[in-house]
């Protein structure tokens, strides 16, 4: 995405207002329920570690094995830790060359124990057919893969205009994989609804994306209201692939929060 950008997981809790960190502990006001939340984002096909210079010294950095080690350490403390991802899990190394045929990135998120992820702009780099093939490959692998959520795809507008071939491919793949506006997950004694949002900046940075999207903030509000009406949950979380800027007035994730 453009400029310096970070994708954040927005934790929306009625009883609690707190800044979000890479590792978050949430607790109800009465102290009755506790939840640990970990999240990743923009892993960009970096399944393997690589050698680079850090503070003048050559070091081996990155890689899913290191992330897995950290997650496993946290899960030893709390097996019911919620693990979320903010999208852009693909495109960035040679691993992307098997994006459509192996779905290596999404399957590896499953290996990490990721519960829920969403789409980033780079998931659309191989066009509609590439994303559709990747989703079907991941589903057909038979492995445990993360749930995928995005609440602001404007299917009504696209269907009114008549779905293109690419849009039909993605619609079919969404159905096969089970992509939803939101999902409900139980972690120990805590029930969490997780929704996904694809931001305006993400769309501007995805020229090969054929989908149309509704306003992310309004869609998130509407989905939260739907969750409150239909689901009995302790907490609502949103994984958003948007942008943050110094000016809070135009910073998408901060506006969404």
Report residues per predicted region:
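Sec-dependent signal peptide cleavage junction
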Residues: 18-31
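Bacterial N-terminal signal peptides
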Residues: 11-19
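Short, intrinsically disordered, low-complexity terminal segments
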Residues: 1, 25-26, 190
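Acidic, metal/ion-coordinating pockets
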Residues: 29-257
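Bacterial N-terminal signal peptides that target proteins for export
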Residues: 1-11
């Amino acid at each position: 995405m453009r400029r310096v950008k970070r994708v954040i997981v927005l934790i929306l809790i009625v009883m609690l207002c707190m800044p979000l960190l890479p590792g978050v502990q949430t607790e109800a006001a009465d102290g009755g329920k506790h939840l640990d939340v970990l999240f990743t984002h923009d892993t960009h096909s970096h399944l393997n570690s690589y050698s680079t210079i850090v503070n003048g010294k050559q070091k081996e950095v990155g890689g899913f094995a290191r992330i897995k080690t950290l997650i496993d350490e946290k899960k030893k403390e709390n097996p019911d830790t919620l693990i979320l991802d903010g999208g852009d899990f693909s495109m960035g190394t040679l691993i992307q060359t098997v994006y459509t045929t192996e779905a290596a990135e999404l399957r590896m998120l499953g290996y990490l124990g990721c519960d829920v992820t969403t789409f980033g702009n780079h998931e659309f780099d191989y066009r509609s057919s590439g994303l559709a093939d990747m989703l079907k490959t991941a589903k057909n692998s038979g492995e445990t893969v993360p749930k995928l959520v995005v609440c602001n795809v404007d299917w009504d507008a696209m269907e009114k205009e008549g779905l293109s071939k690419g849009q039909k491919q993605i619609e079919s793949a969404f159905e096969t994989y089970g992509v939803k506006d939101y999902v409900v997950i139980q972690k120990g004694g805590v029930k969490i609804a997780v929704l996904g949002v694809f931001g305006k900046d993400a769309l501007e940075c995805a020229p090969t994306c054929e989908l149309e999207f509704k306003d992310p903030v309004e869609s998130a509000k509407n989905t939260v209201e739907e969750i409150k009406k239909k689901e009995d949950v302790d907490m609502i979380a949103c994984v958003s692939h948007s942008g943050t800027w110094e000016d809070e007035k135009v910073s998408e994730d901060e506006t969404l929060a």
